[in-house]
Amino acid sequence: MLEESSEPGWLSEEVKTGTTIIAIEFDGGVVLGSDSRVSAGETVVNRVMNKLSLLHDKIYCALSGSAADAQTIAEMVNYQLDVHSIEVGEDPQVRSAATLVKNISYKYKEELSAHLIVAGWDKRGGGQVYVTLNGLLSRQPFAVGGSGSAYVYGFVDAEYRKAMSKEDCQQFVVNTLSLAMSRDGSSGGVAYLVTIDEKGAEEKCILGNELPTFYDQ
């Protein structure tokens, strides 16, 4: 008699974004980028998840950690920013969005496993990038996160330059993601980019076979 088959192990694993995420400021805006692989244990459960989540018209966040936790935080902040913008009659500031993410992350630090990079543009501060890890709130010229970040810290430190143009920042993000995706087993799929400036947000998806390649020399 055949024994009843047990459910696959990945069904009981927490779904995590794995992830490489990055954001960088340029004069007049920001560029965010992420890979698209989502894993549960050793199983890839989604190859094309967009980890760049809209918080408001000109504010996005990049998600890493538990997929459910990160998406929940993003949805909570999106709702609160919508209410806030209606109450004050103007678009929210990027720092306000980052502060909301920081407060939620810290309040539920024992229950949640997520790291969000918040970036966007507002008329008071221009392009801004904020790190919100474990209740920290820090503005940085650029930030990287996720499991793939360990493979690219040397690259970004060597390649980053002050006062980079929008096009240079876009290429910097693409190169960083491509390198991380080729090294980190938890990062992969396609690369998502969002460029935000005074005019609004422009989203772009770059297929895996269109990414630059990095080979060991």
Curated annotation (Swiss-Prot):
What post-translational events are described?
Answer: Autocleaved. The resulting N-terminal Thr residue of the mature subunit is responsible for the nucleophile proteolytic activity.
Locations listed in the record: Cytoplasm; Nucleus
**Species this protein is from:** Salmo salar
Q: How does it assemble?
A: The 26S proteasome consists of a 20S proteasome core and two 19S regulatory subunits. The 20S proteasome core is composed of 28 subunits that are arranged in four stacked rings, resulting in a barrel-shaped structure. The two end rings are each formed by seven alpha subunits, and the two central rings are each formed by seven beta subunits. The catalytic chamber with the active sites is on the inside of the barrel. Component of the immunoproteasome, where it displaces the equivalent housekeeping subunit PSMB6.
Q: Which gene encodes it?
A: psmb9-a
Q: Which UniProt keywords apply?
A: Cytoplasm, Hydrolase, Immunity, Nucleus, Protease, Proteasome, Threonine protease, Zymogen
Its annotated function is as follows:
The proteasome is a multicatalytic proteinase complex which is characterized by its ability to cleave peptides with Arg, Phe, Tyr, Leu, and Glu adjacent to the leaving group at neutral or slightly basic pH. The proteasome has an ATP-dependent proteolytic activity. This subunit is involved in antigen processing to generate class I binding peptides.
Please list the GO biological process terms of this entry. immune system process; proteolysis involved in protein catabolic process
Q: Which domain of life is it from?
A: Eukaryota
Q: What is this protein called?
A: Proteasome subunit beta type-9
Q: Which reaction does it catalyse?
A: Cleavage of peptide bonds with very broad specificity
Q: Which family does it belong to?
A: Belongs to the peptidase T1B family.
